[in-house]
């Protein structure tokens, strides 16, 4: 749980009226590590229950003694649920949030944004024409996909979640990575993101081809091609781009460098405000083409970011979100929900059975 003082500071950071170059008011549980050339931008299968009659009996007795509404088996000292419920996933959420709070040793003080990026990149490979890719499979565990340039640096996020997977072997990597993204968004004071489990893990044969994720060095034609392939429209593209309020780029991953906003641990509409209200110029350096703010030269925008104010249709939504954080949150939540569920063969009739997890700030 975050301390009361940190929660107050973070809430104040979001609620206060900011000048364009005000320093971040909060560092809390949120995080600042989105990197890799993206636009927003080796593990085993889950353990299975033992077939031992003795293990089954011991597990059943233990569950009965605990008053549990499900049975489990003992597998290497870890409980494997057969019918996990909302409360079980809330427990996993809470443990992810605790790890975010207890591990401030990553980029800018938290792993939050890199967890969002992991969930995003696991989902953003979807192709509606072939029905391949998406968050179902967690195929980034394997070298073909994990080694794609757009996924550089995401091993840190996958490794961060490994202790959670070991503690709760009943959750698939696919569901865990998305739950990690949901948790990170909410713990960084973003909107509530509805969640439903049901993803399964696949082997390396299901890895998607390289090139399905956005290239931040490109402009609106490329951006539309990538997102239209997944089934998004212009409004949803701009809403999803708002995730660039979080984290930063790294020269050793994407080649780009710097954060998009001054408060990269709190999700707000500042990204859109800065795009519209600040003057941007090409950065003078030996790296790939990117922009810096003319005043402080401490913020950056990528070519794919700039198309949100260069393209007439994109700019319309950029203005709307800059003017209305509540509207941004509403549309961002809906677009992220759609992204995280692309290509997942959920059981029929579960569309209205999504869960909302309680953040640690409540």
Swiss-Prot record:
What top-level branch of life does the organism fall under?
Answer: Eukaryota
What top-tier enzyme class does this entry carry? oxidoreductase
Per UniProt, which keywords does this protein have?
Heme, Iron, Metal-binding, Mitochondrion, Oxidoreductase, Peroxidase, Transit peptide
Principal localization reads: mitochondrion
* Cofactor, free-text remark: Binds 1 heme b (iron(II)-protoporphyrin IX) group per subunit.
Instruction: Please give one Pfam family short name.
Output: peroxidase
Q: Which cofactor does it need?
A: heme b
Catalytic activity as recorded in UniProt:
2 Fe(II)-[cytochrome c] + H2O2 + 2 H(+) = 2 Fe(III)-[cytochrome c] + 2 H2O
Query: What EC designation does it have?
Result: 1.11.1.5
Q: Where in the cell is it found?
A: Mitochondrion matrix; Mitochondrion intermembrane space
Cross-referenced PROSITE patterns: PEROXIDASE_1, PEROXIDASE_2, PEROXIDASE_4
PANTHER family per record: CYTOCHROME C PEROXIDASE, MITOCHONDRIAL (PTHR31356:SF58), THYLAKOID LUMENAL 29 KDA PROTEIN, CHLOROPLASTIC-RELATED (PTHR31356)
Name of the protein in question: Cytochrome c peroxidase, mitochondrial
**Per the UniProt entry, what species is this protein from, by scientific name?**
Pyricularia oryzae (strain 70-15 / ATCC MYA-4617 / FGSC 8958)
Q: Which gene encodes it?
A: CCP1
